[in-house]
């Protein structure tokens, strides 16, 4: 069970991270992908399109991360923050400090990754 001090530490850390991510998400996309209207060069247009795609993928990733931070704060409120969703054991404080949105202990995360690796190796090759 997390100590009161650790709970306060993680609440502050997650709240700060949420504030930072929300500020990034509020930044207009056009400021990142501002394009000159007069540019008619095909290579420039392709490059700008690629930049726009990258920016939108980055925003999507930020949105998912915001949701994970909110979920971590909710787990803190519910008293289940730091408990592995797979085995119900405590997630180490060291792991939580490295990845405060973690929902799996390191052992369950390794098992999950190994399983995903095996499934990935079993996918048919289309080459």
Locate predicted features.
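Short, Lys/Arg-rich amphipathic alpha-helical interaction segments
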Residues: 93-127
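Interaction interfaces in information-processing and related assembly proteins
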Residues: 1-78, 114-127
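Cys/His-enriched microdomains
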Residues: 82-85, 103
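Amphipathic alpha-helical recognition patches that constitute DNA-binding helices
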Residues: 9, 13, 86, 100
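Short, flexible, mixed-charge glycine/proline-rich loop motifs
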Residues: 72-81, 94-99
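Short, cysteine/histidine-rich loop/knuckle motifs that typically chelate Zn2+
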Residues: 86-87, 107
